[in-house]
């Protein structure tokens, strides 16, 4: 039996082929993650006598090209947790790490665990895209939180508590009422610099333009809040630019987050287990970030 140890890195892999009792079938050599080089590797491994199994570590996405190609070529591929391999054979006082030694170590690990090596099965396209989309969603959510905190920090000096003026939830497209409001009124003096009647009329026009419900009492509350706060940042073109740009960045992140959320919902709905999961108690759709 032959065990192929593959130490994977970005765009390339180190290959070593071992047999029991420490027999080196093929000394360690490097293979790029290109179709031509992987084809040559497949042919080389296919010409070996006896059963051949391939062992590699989970390394983010780096192992996927080699694992998928060799799986499609008909080889028994096993992708094992890196911690399991790390603790294997670590009795030496001198633990030098090289790609060649790691490839041999993986091959020996596969020989010692031959009967229990888990078989790698590639994910179908829908699940792969769903997982990838979710990772992007998580990254985008972190960016949105950072941008939202940045905008609130700016408003603390230009329009204190503006983010608390409205309790409306975010819309399906990711937009929020308070964010849209400060884009039009980036400074508290944009409100208290007007008379109560003029601001109310202007606020009503703004609500109609953006599709929000107008409430007379709410307009008066906003006016009272703006007039009751002291702004540190002066009302200048620079102050307006800072707030408007912060709003623009936050809107873009929120729109991206909403688009990714809708795509995840669409992908998940195509899975066969979706109706069963959605029928479970406590499970519901996520509408906001």
Where are these regions (language model features)?
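A detector of single, family-specific signature residues
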Residues: 1-289
């Amino acid at each position: 039996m032959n065990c192929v140890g593959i130490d994977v890195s970005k765009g390339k892999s180190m290959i070593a082929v071992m047999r029991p009792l420490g027999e080196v079938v093929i000394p360690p050599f490097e293979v790029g993650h290109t179709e031509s080089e992987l084809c040559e590797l497949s042919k080389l491994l296919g010409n070996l006598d006896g059963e051949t199994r391939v062992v590699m570590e989970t390394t983010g996405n780096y192992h996927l090209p080699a694992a998928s190609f060799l799986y499609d070529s008909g080889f028994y591929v096993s992708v094992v947790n890196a911690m399991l391999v790390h603790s294997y054979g670590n009795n030496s006082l001198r633990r030098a790490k090289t790609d060649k030694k790691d490839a041999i170590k993986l091959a020996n690990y596969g020989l010692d665990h031959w009967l229990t090596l888990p078989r790698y099965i590639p994910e179908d396209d829908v699940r792969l895209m769903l997982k990838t989309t979710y990772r992007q969603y998580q990254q985008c959510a972190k960016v949105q939180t950072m941008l939202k905190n940045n905008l609130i920090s700016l408003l603390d000096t230009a329009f204190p508590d503006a983010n608390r003026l409205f309790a409306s939830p975010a819309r399906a497209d990711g937009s929020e009422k308070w964010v849209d409001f400060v884009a039009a009124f980036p400074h508290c003096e944009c409100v208290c610099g007007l008379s109560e009647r003029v601001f109310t009329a202007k606020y009503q026009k703004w609500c109609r333009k953006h599709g929000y419900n107008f409430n007379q009492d709410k307009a008066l509350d906003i006016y009272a809040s703006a007039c009751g706060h002291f702004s540190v940042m002066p009302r200048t073109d620079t102050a307006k630019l800072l707030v408007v740009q912060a709003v623009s960045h936050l809107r873009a992140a929120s729109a991206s987050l909403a688009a990714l959320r809708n795509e995840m919902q669409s992908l998940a709905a195509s899975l066969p287990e979706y109706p069963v999961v959605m029928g479970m108690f406590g499970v519901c759709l996520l509408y906001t970030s």
